[in-house]
Amino acid sequence: MDRRDPPGAFDFSRYLGMLQKQGHNFIRLWAWDSTTLDSRANGALGKPFVHHAAPQPWLRTGPGLALDGKPKFDLSKHNPAYFARLRSRVQEAGKRGIYVSVMLFEGWGMMHGGRERGSAPPGWPWRSHPFHKDNNVNGVNGDTDGDDRTGEVHSLAVPAANKVQAAYIRRVVDTVGDLKNVLYEVINEGGRRDWNRWVIETVRERERQRRVRHPIGLTGHGAERLADMLDGAADWVSPGRLDGYGDDPPAWSRERPSLLDTDHIWGVGGSADWVWKAFTRGHNPLFMDPYEGVVLDEPRERWEQVRAAMGHARALADRLDLAAMTPRNGLASTGYCLAEPGVAYVAYLPAGGQVVLNLVGISGTFRAEWVHPLTGARIAGPTVEGGAQRSLTAPFGGPAVVLMSLSRGTAQAALTPQRPSGAPRFAKARGRHEVASLSVRG
């Protein structure tokens, strides 16, 4: 995606190399339902021109021309180049130990971006959508209310569109379903509740036929709020600002993992401080990285700090038995603590200085290790005994992270660095979370 039409090549290998260098292990692989993005709808983050998105899942064969002057889509004919690139990119990420959340549909455009935002003309996403009646040769018309602004294709109101969507979903599963580093995302910030569940079931049905299973998630700021997303079939969810998950995210205690994404909080935003708060509150922090600033925002020094914090948090996560850990705000005086009581504690000190850890009723000897949240530097701390409140002081100024681990017995095995081998796996167990980085739209 870029301002050229057709878009220029995106150096995906270089991008993955940046993620790998930073120690990141996750991307959202964006879909874009329309053929354009008018990022003026993104306000200050946007660009003063229209972006073009290609390839699309369907061939443009005509007969006849679409609203953009190009051949109309034939929604009965999949585009082999689209699915070949999808598989290639997922495979390349897997070789680098990176999970890929394959986005099936994109909803921000029609649900938010096309509704008179910024200086972008209303309805731009719908007029460049393949399911617009003037853009395909199959007679599919997703605009049930006739406003020519927001097609109702992310609902069950258009059976002809749903039939095309089901065939596309099956093709995606057939394309990447054998790869172990795959997750699915129903739609970015969109989709009616019954349609979201229909998409999940369509994926599940195809996976049952193929005897495979991958996690499927729902993301916030669409037609559903968090309570709705949790009351359904999704394996993971991504809360948003409207549900109270912003600068100071509350602790996560749900069975389904939380992939807390800056996209659904600020768009491009966040800070190193937010990364560590989210991590010690039990979330998987994701960063919508503007990367080179081609689509949104610009390269900034503050984003380098976010990337660094993500990598250092992920490095610490790899040393822990996260499946056994849960957020326990009350065990640290700062209110940020991830713990397996009696075995391991990770506390974050946003203001640095001193933290008091509650080891009352806990026996054993613990050793402390300090981690600098921006550099990843590790400094050995004191050894303390359980059984009381214990105070620790950071050996450097500014924010700090401390790891307290039991220094004897079999529990020590939980703190041994684990070197991943082969394709990465996504663990669903409560409390298990991976610190990750989110792909740019490209």
For every predicted segment, state its role.
Residues M1-A227, D231-A234:
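Active-site mouth of glycoside hydrolases
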Residues M1-S13, Q22, Q412-G442:
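Mature N-terminal, pre-catalytic/accessory segment of carbohydrate-active enzymes
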Residues K21, M229-G232, S253, L338-P341, ...:
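Flexible, charged surface loops at secondary-structure boundaries
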Residues V164-A167, V176-A308:
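Extracellular glycoside hydrolase catalytic/binding regions
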Residues G267-T383, S391-P420:
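Aromatic- and carboxylate-lined catalytic core of secreted/periplasmic carbohydrate-active enzymes
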